[in-house]
Amino acid sequence: MIGKEVTLQDIVLELTEPQTVDLHCEEELPEQDTEVEPERRAYKIILCCGGGCGTRLRLFVAATQFGIRGLQDLLLEEVVILCPDCRNSDLQHGGQ
């Protein structure tokens, strides 16, 4: 711009053809590997009834290494397994 007022000669337009991008190109995406499921192993858990009667209980599970450690933590701290006799005497039906 030369001077205080804008004139049409001061504006330079570069009119070029925009480059188009072929969105339907023939490029193929590689097949994604299917997520490998962690290996589950069978475990036999022998524990005493948590109701106090001392009955030995057997529990069979299939779990990952992480899962069996989590179950171990739950059984040692938060959850107890009951035998059928103790279950009948102390059963809560979800607040009923």
UniProtKB/Swiss-Prot annotation:
It holds the Pfam family E7. GO terms for cellular component: host cell cytoplasm; host cell nucleus. Highly phosphorylated. Gene3D superfamilies: 3.30.160.330. GO terms for biological process: DNA-templated transcription; symbiont-mediated perturbation of host cell cycle G1/S transition checkpoint; symbiont-mediated suppression of host innate immune response; symbiont-mediated suppression of host type I interferon-mediated signaling pathway. Residues 1-37 are annotated as: E7 terminal domain. Keywords: Activator, DNA-binding, Early protein, G1/S host cell cycle checkpoint dysregulation by virus, Host cytoplasm, Host nucleus, Host-virus interaction, Inhibition of host innate immune response by virus, Inhibition of host interferon signaling pathway by virus, Interferon antiviral system evasion, Metal-binding, Modulation of host cell cycle by virus, Oncogene, Transcription, Transcription regulation, Viral immunoevasion, Zinc, Zinc-finger. GO terms for molecular function: DNA binding; DNA-binding transcription factor activity; protein domain specific binding; zinc ion binding. It is found in: Host cytoplasm; Host nucleus. A zinc finger (unnamed) spans 49-86. A motif (Nuclear export signal) lies at residues 68-76. A motif (LXCXE motif) lies at residues 23-27. HAMAP family: PPV_E7. The E7 terminal domain is an intrinsically disordered domain, whose flexibility and conformational transitions confer target adaptability to the oncoprotein. It allows adaptation to a variety of protein targets and exposes the PEST degradation sequence that regulates its turnover in the cell. Belongs to the papillomaviridae E7 protein family. Plays a role in viral genome replication by driving entry of quiescent cells into the cell cycle. Stimulation of progression from G1 to S phase allows the virus to efficiently use the cellular DNA replicating machinery to achieve viral genome replication. E7 protein has both transforming and trans-activating activities. Induces the disassembly of the E2F1 transcription factor from RB1, with subsequent transcriptional activation of E2F1-regulated S-phase genes. Interferes with host histone deacetylation mediated by HDAC1 and HDAC2, leading to transcription activation. Homodimer. Homooligomer. Interacts with host RB1; this interaction induces dissociation of RB1-E2F1 complex thereby disrupting RB1 activity. Interacts with host EP300; this interaction represses EP300 transcriptional activity. Interacts with protein E2; this interaction inhibits E7 oncogenic activity. Interacts with host TMEM173/STING; this interaction impairs the ability of TMEM173/STING to sense cytosolic DNA and promote the production of type I interferon (IFN-alpha and IFN-beta). This is Protein E7.
